[in-house]
Amino acid sequence: MPKLIILPHKILLPKGGVFNAMKGESILNVALRNNVEIEHACEKSCVCTTCHCYIWKGASSLSICEEKEEDVLDKAWNLQFNSRLSCQAKINNKDIEIEIPKYTINQ
């Protein structure tokens, strides 16, 4: 079973965490199921950037970043090469390590 590793975040998860994930489950759904309240203003419909995260390990095993997600990501605060929307990035067979940005456009 793949794991979602979330690096420490000052507000949402001060000590970080490791959570079991199911293949095909989005990063956001794994986090929410484990009471990590990543903001998701658009209710997972891929129109905002509040669930933006950085993928530090396992990016190649995530679902492909579709054009719509890429277009929305262009509006994200502090966009980086490893940015994904956690509502769209689906976990496959490998462990994934992410960082939740310090800020979002809504914060």
From Swiss-Prot:
Keywords: 2Fe-2S, Electron transport, Iron, Iron-sulfur, Metal-binding, Transport
Residue ranges constituting the 2Fe-2S ferredoxin-type domain according to the UniProt record: 1-104
Electron transport as UniProt keyword: yes
Family: Belongs to the adrenodoxin/putidaredoxin family.
Protein name: 2Fe-2S ferredoxin
Disulfide partners: none
Top-rank taxon: Bacteria
A Pfam family matched in the record: Fer2
A GO MF term: metal ion binding
GO biological process: P450-containing electron transport chain
CC cofactor note: Binds 1 [2Fe-2S] cluster.
Gene3D superfamilies named among the record's database cross-references: 3.10.20.30
GO cellular component: cytosol
Residues binding [2Fe-2S] cluster: C42, C48, C51, C87
Cofactors: [2Fe-2S] cluster
Keyword Lipid biosynthesis: no
Protein task: Ferredoxin are iron-sulfur proteins that transfer electrons in a wide variety of metabolic reactions.
